[in-house]
Swiss-Prot record:
The gene is rpo10. GO terms for cellular component: cytoplasm; DNA-directed RNA polymerase complex. Its main location: cytoplasm. Belongs to the archaeal Rpo10/eukaryotic RPB10 RNA polymerase subunit family. It comes from Staphylothermus marinus (strain ATCC 43588 / DSM 3639 / JCM 9404 / F1). This is DNA-directed RNA polymerase subunit Rpo10. Zn(2+) binds at residues 7, 10, 44-45. It is an enzyme of class 2 (transferase). Binds 1 zinc ion. DNA-dependent RNA polymerase (RNAP) catalyzes the transcription of DNA into RNA using the four ribonucleoside triphosphates as substrates. It is found in: Cytoplasm.
Length: 66
């Protein structure tokens, strides 16, 4: 699914940080360090990044039901 624009718990805007987080983690950086560098301090917001799973492409493989 798409990454949320805001944290589900506190409502802080976090969506603008997703691409930078994803790029740096894929490059091999520690996710916790990346979140610290991006200024994500609340554990509820950090959870949003660490628990997000991209499944959009898997869902697209299912046929439409009429």
């Amino acid at each position: 699914m798409m990454f949320p624009v805001r944290c589900f718990t506190c409502g802080a805007p976090i969506g603008h940080l997703w691409e930078e987080f994803k790029k740096r983690v894929e490059a091999g950086e520690d996710p916790g360090k990346v979140l610290d560098d991006l200024g994500v301090k609340r554990y509820c917001c950090r959870r949003m990044f660490l628990s997000h799973i991209e499944i959009s492409y898997e869902i697209l493989n299912f046929p439409k039901v009429s």
